[in-house]
Amino acid sequence: MAAPWWRVVLNGSRNWRGFSTSAALSRRAAPLGPMPNEDIDVSNLERLKKYRSFDRYRRRAEREARDPHWWRTYREHFGEESDPKDTVDIGLPPPKVCRTQQLLERKRVLRELRTSVEEERASRLRTASIPLEAVRAEWERTCGPYHKQRLAEYYGLYRDLFHGATFVPRVPLHVAYAIGEDDLVPVYYGNEVTPTEAAQPPEVTYEADEGSMWTLLLTNLDGHLLEPDAEYVHWLVTNIPGSRVAEGEETCPYLPPFPARGSGFHRFAFLLFKQDKPVDFSGDTRPSPCYQLAQRTFHTFDFYKKHQDAMTPAGLAFFQCRWDDSVTHIFHQLLDMREPVFEFVRPPPYHPKQKCFPHRQPLRYLDRYRDSHEPTYGFY
């Protein structure tokens, strides 16, 4: 005979396992401003204004997205708050250019090109040639310094050299390494130069007024073997009269790049400082020759902080360099030390906990958990 229904319910309720949770309700605070769509009367949606066009809706949505709100979006909440106005500019002031005169000059050049019969004929016959040297000179004079600044920020030069302070390289700095008698390897803004090509001091040229004083620095930002935040100074020429680098005081003799094997690309930066007056750099002088790495330990930030009242960064050029066979000769013959070799040790691959019965797994499943690299079931 079946038990009464109330007995079944009673016995079932006694054996029922209750549900519990450790979650707690958070206290809801009043919003800091009006919430989205709180002015809409949801009880009568028919009276709402109809857009009747997707274009109207899109324009209204874009206008609403551009309007300031009291809440922060996802990008604003997780994005880095970096205001370019907060950075310190330690460079030369921008040149004073009359915008009206500049526009008039451009219009004059366009008018001459449009009225020139020779230019029209060369363009029609596709025989026109563009003077690249003039184009580069115009680029250096107008937007080139700002492009160089963006490249230096991308490579982290300002962050590592001046602790975040920035400057616009107003003075074009041209650096080239001589290979043989005729070939030159130029240094631009991040190109690769091998240690073999940079074995000898480069040719450095720039435009300078007669009577001005300059300082030229070559430093390795990534090559220090003991201190992660230190640099190696490879060349330092101070009190340069005008653009005659050979007549300056070689405070630190030139040392070829020696990026250690396995350490990847190193950043080498040429910095040109403009001096207000002759400066005494006796405290920064290194012996000649200088093959002790401890004596070449350098901090550009401390060097500039020490002489910031008398000089201003004005020019910049940098290249990337990695190991080749000539670095071994530098370590053994010049530095008289054993060559360090680095290797990137990859982390071990992650494998989940081994199952006792790996259902529907391939045969090589067991190879993941063996100490040796020999396959369990041969080659397959």
Curated annotation (Swiss-Prot):
It comes from the Eukaryota. SUPFAM superfamilies: PEBP-like. InterPro entries: PEBP, PEBP-like_sf, PEBP_euk. It is found in: Mitochondrion. Its main location: mitochondrion. The keyword Acyltransferase does not apply. Residues 101-122 form a coiled coil. GO terms for cellular component: mitochondrial inner membrane; mitochondrial large ribosomal subunit. Component of the mitochondrial ribosome large subunit (39S) which comprises a 16S rRNA and about 50 distinct proteins. Belongs to the phosphatidylethanolamine-binding protein family. Mitochondrion-specific ribosomal protein mL38 subfamily. PANTHER family: LARGE RIBOSOMAL SUBUNIT PROTEIN ML38 (PTHR11362:SF133), PHOSPHATIDYLETHANOLAMINE-BINDING PROTEIN (PTHR11362). This is Large ribosomal subunit protein mL38. It comes from Bos taurus. The lineage of its organism: Eukaryota, Metazoa, Chordata, Craniata, Vertebrata. The gene is MRPL38.
